[in-house]
């Protein structure tokens, strides 16, 4: 886990970045979510590629809203930030929370989700979706929707030497 030192009124305080990711916890698992709570936001994309400054600001704002209302899971390994692209020009972000967050777009997800962990570049997502489709076929399942959770921010992915992502396939309501 990376520790970033942050200056605060002349003192140095450690600030945790991304928690260490354990692929075995998420790989080839089935999750049954019954109104799992999230806050939702969206960012513009250009053919599924988000604009980094806008994305960073949006994620920071979502995290701050959840933290300020004490509705972010205290176990950072349990926090999910899911991405779904309803079009090539828009990405929706879903941050898991423990309760409703004031002044945020609160939503929930329900259904059966099958997850699989991949390690590779962002541009490999279409290939990973094809691999996930093959995996689901072996189980006589078909994805209705896909959500992607990136285990590390770009800085931590570089430090850890892995760009893990969890593909969540919604297979039933």
Where are these regions (language model features)?
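A solvent-exposed interaction/effector surface
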Residues: 1-173
């Amino acid at each position: 886990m990376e520790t970033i030192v942050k200056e605060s009124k002349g003192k140095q305080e450690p600030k945790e970045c991304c928690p260490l990711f354990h692929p075995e916890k998420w790989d080839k698992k089935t999750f049954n979510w019954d109104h799992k709570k999230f806050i939702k936001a969206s960012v513009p994309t250009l053919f599924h590629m988000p604009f980094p400054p806008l994305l960073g600001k949006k994620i920071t704002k979502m995290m701050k809203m959840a933290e300020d209302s004490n509705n972010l899971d205290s176990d950072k390994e349990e926090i999910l930030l899911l991405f779904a692209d309803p079009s090539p020009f828009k990405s929706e972000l879903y941050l898991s929370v423990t309760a409703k967050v004031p002044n945020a777009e609160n939503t929930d997800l329900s259904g059966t989700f099958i997850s699989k962990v991949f390690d590779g570049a962002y541009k490999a997502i279409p290939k990973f979706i094809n691999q996930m489709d093959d995996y689901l076929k072996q189980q006589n399942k078909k994805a209705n929707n896909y959500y992607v959770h990136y285990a590390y921010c770009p800085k931590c992915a570089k430090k850890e030497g892995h760009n893990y992502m969890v593909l969540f396939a919604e297979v039933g309501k």
